[in-house]
């Protein structure tokens, strides 16, 4: 074979090889395209099935929180959560908040809180000691997490609020507007369903803790009128976010603010703040038809702040150190009562739980259990109740729980801001321990210097 023939032969082989390679590449591309088309087609075909499955799961997850069980028997309180939001907020993006509270559905517990439209250690945190402003909003995040823009859900524009879950959706109540004409906006599953206008034109306000749901209906207490005199108080019954009934309390010489409410055996009990003239706490209990009873916790172990030293109580308001007050709670067990209160009698510091076995009906100051929650040398603040339904816990009773706000900043500390973190505890019938779980942040922050 001469050189020219060799060149032609080699060239022919290369050409054939190239053509075969090209055909294989074209075949591979066609195979990929066909495979992708089939895969995409299958995706489109399966989407309705996927949505159906999702909706079915959602429907299965929806229950009606009955609220017909009694409170679980307990002998103490186990720590449930601590968010450390002020400590984390010295370097992280954490909201400036007040009035945190916890509420649980049958699937989860969430921390709700009133933001100031500002972050800690930022210039907009200046002046956030103010209670009512158009920048305040109700938001929520998973319980135990520091509230930040990255884990929080907007709920409502509000400087006073409540929220609860009926087993199907979240109900939120957000009050905003001017002092002389505020409006409560009710949302169900995030959609506005009703409104309540201030009826006394004097700072309409509500619980700053969870509302209470029984058999698909949810209940809340609102106040309108003076904070240092006779005001007007109403109970509202709501179904799927709409007010279906309300009643004004006939309660001369009583004063109800910032009630902490819970279901128990199909009825609702609320323990509130008397900002007018009582250092013991007023209560109102009612059934699902809003037929109610009223009173004051009789115990000589006084629950408000400021308050006198423990002594002889009264089933009416105890006037000694009775003016002003702080949001709080108690749990009734027959004639006995678990009382949550600050350790200090004149400042919002420290916190303790006390079991008075006859304190709901008797006026002596004897008690049998005291559990430390926060040392008197550390700041506390508001406190309130929440419950965990059997649909969440798997128990055959309603578990009582409470949260404590740990206020930091103004007016007691040298900062430009006011905010707080929170801790929570739930009742158990097993071993517990008393200790101090303070906020623990080192102040001032960089913005304060």
UniProtKB/Swiss-Prot annotation:
This protein's UniProt keywords: Calcium, Disulfide bond, Glycoprotein, Glycosidase, Host cell membrane, Host membrane, Hydrolase, Membrane, Metal-binding, Signal-anchor, Transmembrane, Transmembrane helix, Virion
Domain of life: Viruses
Region Head of neuraminidase: start-end pairs: 71-449
Pfam family for this entry, one: Neur
Disulfide bonds: 72-397, 104-109, 164-211, 213-218, 259-272, 261-270, 298-315, 401-426
Annotated region (Involved in apical transport and lipid raft association), positions in chain: 11-33
Record membrane topology: Single-pass type II membrane protein
HAMAP family reported for this sequence: INFV_NRAM
Protein name, per record: Neuraminidase
Organism whose genome encodes this protein: Influenza A virus (strain A/Vietnam/1203/2004 H5N1)
Source taxonomy: Viruses, Riboviria, Orthornavirae, Negarnaviricota, Polyploviricotina
